[in-house]
Swiss-Prot record:
This is E3 ubiquitin-protein ligase TRIM13. It comes from Bos taurus. The keyword Ubl conjugation applies. The keyword Zinc applies. PANTHER family: E3 UBIQUITIN-PROTEIN LIGASE TRIM. Zn(2+) binds at C94, H97, C117, H123.
Length: 407
């Protein structure tokens, strides 16, 4: 199109030809352009007229006016068609045949095709029509198709759209609610973990304080002993070169007393017993703890005694339970014990009298009396030991409570 436009352009105004006129030399120009040139020649030649020369080849012509020049109807028609093509939309091309315009309509397949598709392609035996006829036919078909489509299931589609949007909104609300539950669950879980962490770390701080209370006094004792030793060495350094007997003897007496005090001061042990928690602590023991059992996390306890397995915060409750249990268990025992003791003492007197009677009555029961006496003595000793054991247990529990200040 650009090359064609060059051939349809006037050399003077550089625009498409407007009412083109052809000169005897066969060059074409717009009528208005030639009129302008002729008017210029008339103004420049006041005394005599100069011949008209072609603007392209400069060949003179005897034309006296533009109207006398021949109209180039062929060129004028080409320019008019070119303007129509230029204004009209660009014609689509065939995808299967490069550059071929889609200028034929296939009625069989109801689609645009090119000339090659119609003569040598898959549409060779189909029915064709012109673009104008196809346009008129499809325009009528469009009206009926559009009307039927406009009412096709529109209400059903709108109803389903409303249902889907409602379901979507409810689903999102449920998901949001579940999401909030999950968030709340993990917040509680995090709170539980933080609580357990703070609890265990607090136990560690308590143990650190206990360690410092155990070691600091011994360390201070050793520092005091070392300081006394340095003072003794300073005294020795001060008077070892003294030549006055009195002064030397006084200093020697002071030095000997200082050495005596230092030697008599016992050194604290260097290996204090460590806490069982420090020996047995290992976080790998927590690896099997499930999230649902996270509240069961605790520091490892001493496995040597039952008391050490009880968490420190439960000691008061444990002691109360022990005291109540002992009181409930041993109250009837103690009651029976003292009443049994009185009965046994009575039985012993009666058996002694009875054995004396049997001894006087017959000698063959002498051995039986001996065994009865042994039995009564054994029961008496058992009751005494049971009473002593009960008192020892109660005293130990009371001392334990007072010592650790659990109540």
């Amino acid at each position: 199109m650009e090359l064609l436009e060059e051939d349809l352009t006037c050399p003077i105004c550089c625009s498409l030809f407007d009412d083109p006129r052809v000169l005897p030399c066969s060059h074409n120009f717009c009528k208005k352009c030639l009129e302008g040139i002729l008017e210029g020649n008339v103004r420049n030649s006041l005394w005599r007229s100069s011949p008209f020369k072609c603007p392209t080849c400069r060949k003179e012509t005897s034309a006296t006016g533009v109207n006398s020049l021949q109209v180039n109807y062929s060129l004028k028609g080409i320019v008019e068609k070119y303007n129509k093509i230029k204004v009209s939309p660009k014609m689509p091309v065939c995808k299967g045949h490069l550059g071929q315009p889609l200028n034929i309509f296939c009625l069989t397949d109801m689609q645009l095709i090119c000339g090659i598709c119609a003569t040598r392609g898959e549409h060779t035996k189909h029915v064709f029509c012109s673009i104008e006829d196809a346009y008129a036919q499809e325009r009528d078909a469009f009206e009926s198709l559009f009307q039927s489509f406009e009412t096709w299931r529109r209400g059903d589609a709108l109803s389903r759209l409303d249902t889907l949007e409602t379901s979507k909104r409810k689903s999102l609300q449920l998901l949001t609610k579940d999401s909030d539950k999950v968030k709340e669950f993990f917040e509680k879980l995090q709170y539980t973990l933080d609580q357990k962490k703070n609890e265990i770390l607090s136990d560690f701080e308590t143990m650190k304080l206990a360690v410092m209370q155990a070691y600091d006094p011994e360390i201070n004792k050793l520092n005091t002993i070392l300081q006394e030793q340095r003072m003794a060495f300073n005294i020795a350094e001060a008077f070892k070169d003294v030549s006055e007997p009195i002064i030397f003897l006084q200093q020697m007496q002071e030095f000997r007393e200082k050495i005596k005090v230092i030697k008599e001061t016992p050194l604290p042990p260097s290996n204090l017993p460590s806490s069982p928690l420090m020996k047995n602590f290992d976080t790998s023991q927590w690896e099997d703890i499930k999230l649902v059992d996270v509240d069961k996390l605790s520091l490892p306890q001493d496995t040597g005694t039952f008391i050490s397995k009880i968490p420190w915060r439960l000691y008061p409750l444990f002691v109360v339970v022990i005291l109540l249990g002992l009181l409930i268990f041993f109250s009837p025992t103690m009651f029976l014990e003292w009443s049994l003791f009185d009965e046994i003492a009575t039985w012993k007197d009666n058996l002694s009298n009875f054995s004396s009677y049997l001894t006087r009555s017959a000698d063959f029961v002498e051995q039986s009396v001996f065994y009865w006496e042994q039995l009564t003595d054994g029961l008496f000793i058992f009751s005494e030991r049971l009473k002593s054991f009960t008192l020892v247990v109660l005293n130990n529990v009371a001392e334990f409570v007072c010592k650790y200040k659990l109540l």
